[in-house]
Curated annotation (Swiss-Prot):
This is Tryptophan synthase alpha chain. The active site is at E56 (proton acceptor), D67 (proton acceptor). InterPro entries: Aldolase_TIM (IPR013785), RibuloseP-bd_barrel (IPR011060), Trp_synthase_alpha_AS (IPR018204), Trp_synthase_suA (IPR002028). It is an enzyme of class 4 (lyase). GO terms for molecular function: tryptophan synthase activity.
Amino acid sequence: MTVKQSQASRLGPIFEACRDDDRAALIGYLPTGYPDVPTSVQAMVALVESGCDIVEVGVPYSDPGMDGPTIARATEAALHGGVRVRDTLAAVEAISAAGGRAVVMTYWNPVLRYGVDAFARDLAAAGGYGLITPDLIPDEAGQWLAASERHGLDRIFLVAPSSTPQRLALTVEASRGFVYAASTMGVTGARDAVSHAAPELVSRVREISDIPVGVGLGVRSREQAAQIGGYADGVIVGSALVSALGDGGLTALRALTEELAAGVRQRAAAS
């Protein structure tokens, strides 16, 4: 069975360019508002300047079911600081102005509160490429599917090792840009060992579609980035970048991003 993509992807040319360079794309996540709004925007621009191909701009949410402790603490601090959804849109504008490509990662409730079509409209106007929705499944995404078509945005849904063949096919068909493969079960966070379930999950997606696959949930080193970059189209890093920013500021964040960018260029074979 082959699952066809419905429309051209905004992110597609980025993955094509990375393939031409014989490497995976580096996709970095930071939450808006941590440690404060201005610094978070500077940090996202620093990701672009340090070799990040795509920036995931996080919308802090009070009930983050999938976030590990590092990101949960950062988003809690951002919420205490008064961060708003409009700050995320401003961050997207800043990334775009710096020559970067931004997607927003958000739980669905903030989008519902904002208004689905209004959010899609304003994200597109800010220069955003799409939306990652970790707690939204395609079956319940009718409003978002319609809004993404109207405003030309990519939609990135999650697949996991536990996804059934039917669920995998449905999710891949609804996705555009890339699919987000959770390389470990459970919440996000940097780990010493990268899940061995990830290569199999990527293979399962590739059996039914040529959509790019990004693998996340655990990467924190150049070696891990190289390992995942050997079989995935995108290497997604979140908790490790948040930790670097919190512990060492922009200098540490830049250093880690440069290390990870070197890692995806190593194309190490998956172990």
